[in-house]
Amino acid sequence: MKKLSKVICLVLSALMLLSLAACGKQAGGADDAQGKPIEGGTFVYAIEEPITSLNWYNNSSTDLGKQVFQNLYDPMWKSNTDGSLDYRLAKSVDISEDGTTYTLTLRDDIYWSDGEKITTDDIVFTLDTLTVPEVAPSTAAAYKVDGEFCTYEKQSDTVIVFKVGRASNLFKKALGTLYVLPAHCFEGVPATEVLTCEQNANIATSGAFVADSFSVGEKLVCLKNPNYYRTAAHIDGFEVRCVSDASTQEIAFRNKELSIFTISNAETLANYKDNDEYQVVSYPDGRITFMEINPTARPCPPWRPVRL
């Protein structure tokens, strides 16, 4: 993205809107014009990037993570605007007074989409994978403080303890956004091959939806997760088609093959904004980069204002 913030318009076909549905507040999503969730139907949309794996860590650093895979995987918790925690897979987290020890407790009613229970074994397996130098997905750095990976020790099937060298708000944020992999789906797979093995085309997930069919680089069809622990989604499922060309996406949208079409230029917007057949929704898309400064580090140069 060349700009930090821009307005993107989502165009919804009025005909497709009749079958369009969204998740409720607990599962995320949108409401109809009257503010009521729309029940049933399948949401169909296109993305430019090809989907080559169902493994979260093969997709977390791209827009696929936000657009697709956050519907398939749940984190430990999400942060509310007031700083409070909206727990998901985690039931609670207790932090020591010095901020170096985190005791995380999982819910005891969470299951993978294939019916297997989610336990701290899955957390240990995921972190063991992230610590492998040959794997080293970009998200692994989030679990390091001063270059050292956190330590972790399973206490029970629902309790695990993390330790870091010093207090770090960024580590707390990273722990909340930890997405775990199903250890039982990778039995016998070397740690160096967890992200590349064939099992990634058909693995269990923890979110509101589960993959029903998957064609690498072409299409992903998802249905409600029958074992989901929170309020079920209002829609029956969604379908993601990999279409790299924006013009081809627009043609499919006009042919009623897609529920939604994303545009980012005024010329294309003019074709839809005054057409009663379509509903145009605009939203700001901001990208924020975080920087952590340690003023106690030595040697530390004299502080002076810095223009970013």
Question: Where are these predicted regions, by residue range?
Answer:
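Surface-exposed binding/hinge segments that line
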Residues: 94, 141-188
